[in-house]
């Protein structure tokens, strides 16, 4: 466990808090999140070590850092093997009216600089708010550390008057992405039902409601209108897998 023997300064206190969370997540077998906290906490301890001059405290810090590094390395090896075997599975349950589940909060753990290609299967990228959801998702993809160059979208076509809105909206998104050096390939299917997002680094995310899991904002000037972390959600389940050999649509 992370103990307060590291010292009482603010940097040490922050490191202890992060590492305490890492140990808790580790005990709950939430290894992916635990690894992130271990790595963050270790970096913080290394900064504390640099600013520590007393030899006895430096010795304590080195010992603790070594222990946390060993545990983090073991978790990383375990997760790598799970991914290699195709056994990795994490489930997140989003409760009714829950907040804090913006696309960035949900996906950032899996968006590394190795991500250059993304596949999205979602039958409901049709109505105006759904097009905005897709646009927000694309905005997230072109931010660092990602280096996305191609996005594949498979969705269902809107029949009737809504078809013009859907096609023109997607075309506008396509042109906008193009100005950022990103190609958007759009395909339609009348039989699509599954909702799935895949990255070419092997991560696969299945959301029960697809990208459309946010509730309608109470008004244009209400919290959550722009910041999706503050927007209440519909109840849904998110399943996360890792497949070394990601299939293309």
Curated annotation (Swiss-Prot):
The C-terminal domain interacts with lipid membranes containing acidic phosphoinositides and is required for location at the midbody. The MIT domain interacts with the MIT-interacting motifs of several components of the ESCRT-III complex. InterPro entries: MIT_dom, MIT_dom_sf, MIT_domain_contain_protein1, MITD1_C, MITD1_C_sf, MITD1_N. The keyword Ion transport does not apply. CDD domains: MIT_1, MIT_C. It is a peripheral membrane protein. It holds the Pfam family MIT. Residues 168-231 are annotated as: Important for association with membranes. It comes from Mus musculus (Mouse). One of its GO terms (molecular function) is protein domain specific binding. This is MIT domain-containing protein 1. Residues 8-86 form the MIT domain. Homodimer. Interacts (via MIT domain) with CHMP1A, CHMP1B, CHMP2A and IST1. It is found in: Late endosome membrane; Midbody; Membrane. The gene is Mitd1. Its main location: membrane. Keywords: Cell cycle, Cell division, Endosome, Membrane, Transport. One of its GO terms (biological process) is midbody abscission. GO terms for cellular component: late endosome membrane; midbody. Required for efficient abscission at the end of cytokinesis, together with components of the ESCRT-III complex. The lineage of its organism: Eukaryota, Metazoa, Chordata, Craniata, Vertebrata.
